[in-house]
Amino acid sequence: PFAPVREMLGHYSEPFGLADARIAHQTRVVERANWKLVWENNRECYHCVAAHPELRRSFPASSSGSLPTDEELRFSEKAEQLGLPSAFTRSDDFQFRATRLQLVNGAQSMTMDGRPAVRGERLGRMPEENVGDVLFYHYPSTWQHWLGDHALTFRTLPLSP
């Protein structure tokens, strides 16, 4: 079932060498609520800005897919020159999609201070340059952030009807 995802997005994940990555931390959160409401809240367009204000230190407040700014275009062009795919891509049914986003405020990683979470090590063949965040979604239940120094994976799973 993952072949279409791998075929379309493998060029995004390959430079990160995720198959060789180690799990540094794992958390399980059980929300005692109607899972449909939890899901809808999570996918709400303004969820991150309202629920996670600390993300605004490094993550763009709006990644709506609107026309990129000149700075964003330069960032994408530089990433492509480094052999790192940047263009927004998606499946025909929008089940999965990926894009590379430029981090804000000079951040190099999605951490509280914007500095790399893992110092002195890069994932796969990531260069020392700021490679931004590859944001990968597989709807409806999985989203991931791949950064130069670490990757984050989130999965939602209803436990009851």
What are these regions (language model features)?
Residues 2-161:
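C-terminal catalytic domain of Rieske-type non-heme iron oxygenases
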